[in-house]
Amino acid sequence: MTIALGKLTKEEKDLFDTMDDWLRRDRFIFVGWSGLLLFPCAYFALGGWFTGTTFVTSWYTHGLASSYLEGCNFLTAAVSTPANSLAHSLLFLWGPEAQGDFTRWCQLGGLWTFVALHGAFGLIGFMLRQFELARSVQLRPYNAIAFSAPIAVFVSVFFIYPLGQSGWFFAPSFGVAAIFRFIRFFQGFHNWTLNPFHMMGVAGVLGAALLCAIHGATVENTLFEDGDGANTFRAFNPTQSEETYSMVTANRFWSQIFGVAFSNKRWLHFFMLFVPVTGLWMSALGVVGLALNLRAYDFVSQEIRAAEDPEFETFYTKNILLNEGIRAWMAAQDQPHENLIFPEEVLPRGNAL
């Protein structure tokens, strides 16, 4: 037998191990390595948005008032996109445009690129946070995969689309009414509602809402009587080992309603994940197509017949005319720097005019 004499030397922790221990410590709010990206970026994005909507005008970029200081409210205030003349400049505060002048930087629209970039990295940090936590507690990473869908939409709308156009000017500004303006722009200039990728996105979001409502109602309807409490929540025991609701009863119910029903909880919940995530991914792909000015469905035969026959009109041809009206009215209002002037006879006229 061999006896080893001497004291065991404990390995010294390096800086990485020390940081890893602190960042991944079990605490009320988990930080993690992803938190190094998430928390600063989220702080700066929200701080920039609150600063912009409170104090900063859009007069120099859009000819608009956009702050509480100018009289806007929560629905009409916005952090607006930079001027079209600045194209795709990242508009750093220290860059050649603002040259370190914070007031000038705000006037040029620098807060928009600041909020957009920090917002995007904040969202990515939140997705990485879900990956990190899932790995720590040995869960599958489907939460993070699902969250990639809204990230894809954000990146495609706020970055890919304006990169395909002439500048950040054509991205959405960060505000409620500003987003509505952007939606109208998408419809008028891209016929977005007739785009098959938009249709898939709508089917995904509304389908997910329907699935959530059906699933929640079905679970509530088939709860086991596991207590004598006054309501569902008082009767529920968080440490129970048995099922909360009867999948068999739910399956029999929907089999009678539709003729088919989910017989497996895994497939049911995967479908509830698949529908909205795929819809949002498809919508993001469609916006990438719009960045390249790819067109939606064109039913040219109907347009030709409507042009030749005054008595022939479809909902499609009516929508095409409405899009032309949006473009004619909106271009001059939306792009004042172009000094667009349309002859009176080409502008659409409604009953109010």
From Swiss-Prot:
Cofactor note: The D1/D2 heterodimer binds P680, chlorophylls that are the primary electron donor of PSII, and subsequent electron acceptors. It shares a non-heme iron and each subunit binds pheophytin, quinone, additional chlorophylls, carotenoids and lipids. There is also a Cl(-1) ion associated with D1 and D2, which is required for oxygen evolution. The PSII complex binds additional chlorophylls, carotenoids and specific lipids.
Alphabetical keyword list: Acetylation, Chlorophyll, Chromophore, Electron transport, Iron, Magnesium, Membrane, Metal-binding, Oxidoreductase, Phosphoprotein, Photosynthesis, Photosystem II, Plastid, Transmembrane, Transmembrane helix, Transport
This protein's GO CC annotations: chloroplast thylakoid membrane; photosystem II
Protein name listed in UniProt: Photosystem II D2 protein
Annotated positions binding a plastoquinone: 215, 262
Gene3D superfamilies reported in the protein's UniProt record: Photosystem II protein D1-like
Residues reported in the UniProt entry to bind Fe cation: 215, 269
Record InterPro entries: D1/D2, Photo_II_D1/D2_sf, Photo_RC_L/M, Photo_RC_L/M_CS, PSII_PsbD/D2
Location in the cell: Plastid membrane
Main enzyme class: oxidoreductase
EC number annotated for this UniProt entry: 1.10.3.9
Membrane topology: Multi-pass membrane protein
